[in-house]
């Protein structure tokens, strides 16, 4: 039976400049930080936090990013978790919603470990096995920047192939991970500039994955290492989701594609709004106009942050659609 953990307090994401944060090195036997972003889903968050007992021996800290929840997450969190509370738990609160991307970046800056496991608040660990397998890949192969996991139900049964990072049935190289649960090499993510905060949520993992690929890194999918994704619909709005998906797809092209490709692809990506709206049965009056206005407002930021990837990176991105088998380097 564990003693009651200390719940650390942290202030707004804007309080401490990242440049002055120099975390002390962690114990070598605890190489993992777990980061969870949450907003207005306390019960779901509690379930996810309780599942972290599976990786407690590996974990240096658990950092919860409270993304402007109407009722702050921190008060009473330890009491609600009881003896299931992670021993080294901290809560970082942003008073206004900033988005998952900002939360993950803050977690990466706060962490002091080589590996960071990001979980959605509705993701649940079923055992330590998936995380241990992912850490083993990162430890053995310095070219790997991220490990993708398959989605499962609470019994460990895999969701359909279309809901996975790949249809592969063996360890494979893939384009991207799914944000619900992914393990990253912290230094690689920070060196790439982290998540694009302008995207907030939806498509942010694919955008980061492309930049990691452009930097020479690889992403490995482990199809036999499931993590449960008990997707919660709380707080979800179909029209807003449609807005985010289309806007972010266009923004990612504007930020990352070579100019000739962006000129051709941006109108196509923008026009996808209409078949998506019909296919989803969304009643979204004025939705297309909102997307266009949001893109216009983002143009100054796009001009500042735009950094096109290489054509060779885009060719490799297309090749990775086939999910070629992953062969780890020979052990020294």
Predicted regions, residues:
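Glycine-rich, basic loop-to-helix element that forms the pyrophosphate-binding segment
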Residues: 94-111
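Short beta-strand/loop segment that forms part of the nucleotide-sugar
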Residues: 60-68, 92-94
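A short, conserved alpha-helix in the catalytic core of glycosyltransferases
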Residues: 181-184, 188-193, 198-226
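Non-catalytic, C-terminal membrane-associated alpha-helical segments of glycosyltransferases
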Residues: 261-332
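Conserved donor NDP-sugar-binding/catalytic core segment of glycosyltransferases
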Residues: 124-159
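Short aromatic/hydrophobic "clamp" motif used to bind/position activated sugar donors
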Residues: 116
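Short, acidic, metal-binding catalytic loop of nucleotide-sugar glycosyltransferases
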Residues: 50-59
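A conserved acidic beta->alpha catalytic loop
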Residues: 66-77, 124
